[in-house]
Design a protein with these regions (language model features):
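Short, charged surface segments at domain edges that flank catalytic/cofactor-binding sites
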Residues: 2-46, 111-123, 128-136
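Short, charged/polar micro-motifs that form catalytic or ligand-binding hotspots
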Residues: 34-37, 66, 70, 82
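Generic detector of intrinsically disordered, low-complexity, polar/charged segments
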Residues: 45, 65-66, 103, 114
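Short, cysteine/histidine-rich loop/knuckle motifs that typically chelate Zn2+
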Residues: 46-47, 82
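Histidine-centered nuclease catalytic patch
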Residues: 48-78, 87-99
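A detector for short metal-coordination/catalytic motifs
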Residues: 74-75, 82-140
């Protein structure tokens, strides 16, 4: 039985070359993007959609590259092609809060990812509520 090794998630694509996971930058970027998508269970961070093909799940720069955003894990999230194109170079929170699929829980998941590089995982609505209440109590 063959098993597929989980790709580690590094802060930057170049870290895959430095760690000798790969020897070229194109493979490094591909591995980095795959690890980000895998961390989010191959779902759009904004609308939660699971795209039909891997190509339709893109990587969105939360702070657009045109506004100085970098290629680093703390600035990118997986987004379906539709969300990525609609957001374009807009400020993510302002854009996201105007969407019909907006969710405060999704916003806080994105914020946690940008802060820590980890996606809070929940098995139930109760677990989500407990986590969200802990975030709110920390903010107060």
């Amino acid at each position: 039985m063959s098993s597929v090794a989980k790709v580690p998630l590094y802060e930057r694509p170049s870290d895959y070359v430095f760690d000798m996971t790969t020897l070229n930058s194109a493979d490094a970027k591909r591995l980095w993007r795959a690890a980000i998508k895998e961390a989010w269970n191959n779902r759009c961070a904004y609308c939660g959609a699971t795209p039909i093909t891997n190509n339709s799940l893109t990587i969105d720069h939360v702070r657009a590259k045109s506004r100085g955003g970098q290629d680093c894990t703390s600035n990118v999230i997986p987004a379906c092609r539709r969300c990525n194109q609609e957001k374009a170079s807009l400020e993510w929170v302002a854009w996201f809060r105007l969407q019909p699929f907006y969710s405060i829980v999704a916003e806080w998941r994105i914020r946690e990812w940008l802060r820590t590089g980890e996606v809070p995982a929940f098995d139930s609505d109760e677990e989500t509520a407990v986590w969200f209440n802990s975030i709110l109590s920390e903010a107060v």
